Swiss-Prot record:
Keywords: Cytoplasm, DNA damage, DNA recombination, DNA repair, DNA-binding, Endonuclease, Hydrolase, Magnesium, Metal-binding, Nuclease. Its EC number is 3.1.21.10. Mg(2+) 2 binds at residue 69. PROSITE patterns: RUVC. The active site is at 9, 69, 141. This is Crossover junction endodeoxyribonuclease RuvC. It is found in: Cytoplasm.
């Protein structure tokens, strides 16, 4: 059975997405990228951009399931902004009635590298290896989203 998995790495400035398609043990990369919002734009407008662009990603790819990185608290100011963007993401996913799977950063690192405290490069190398890419996926937020999608595939 074919299954499309959308991985999301929520953020306000840059929201990463990655879409993979799985069939049995076969894995195919369909798309990846970022939804970017301008820094000097009103927060409401930035959230609206995420809302509209994520709807477009969902309508284009029509995933069966969405895997999303759980919110990680590290700097209060940034965490609040990410939480606002994440709220919009969850709203859009609910509107599309999509099942959601959430993973912590440590779970994602462990699934891809075997080490829950792996660095970003190790995770990107694992993503590139699993998806047979010639180079590391960029930008970082898109690579992180692919890592989330792959984690969902590994955990099936």
């Amino acid at each position: 059975m074919t299954k499309k998995i959308l991985g999301l790495d929520p953020g306000l400035a840059s929201l990463g997405f990655g879409v993979i398609c799985t069939e049995s043990d076969n894995l195919e990369l369909l798309d990846f990228g970022i939804i970017q919002t301008p820094a000097k734009t009103d927060i409401g407008k930035r959230l609206q951009i995420i809302y509209e662009d994520l709807h477009q990603v969902l309508n284009t790819h029509q995933p069966d399931v969405v895997a999303i990185e759980k919110l990680f608290f590290y700097r209060m100011g940034n965490t609040i902004l990410v939480a606002q963007a994440r709220g919009v993401v969850l709203l859009v996913l609910a509107q599309h009635q999509l099942p959601i799977i959430e993973y912590t950063p440590a779970q994602i690192k462990l699934a891809l590298t075997g080490y829950g405290a792996a660095d970003k490069v190790a995770v990107q190398e694992a993503v590139a290896r699993e998806l047979c890419l010639d180079c590391l996926p960029r930008p970082d937020d898109a690579a992180d989203a692919l890592a989330v999608a792959l984690t969902a595939w590994f955990q099936r």
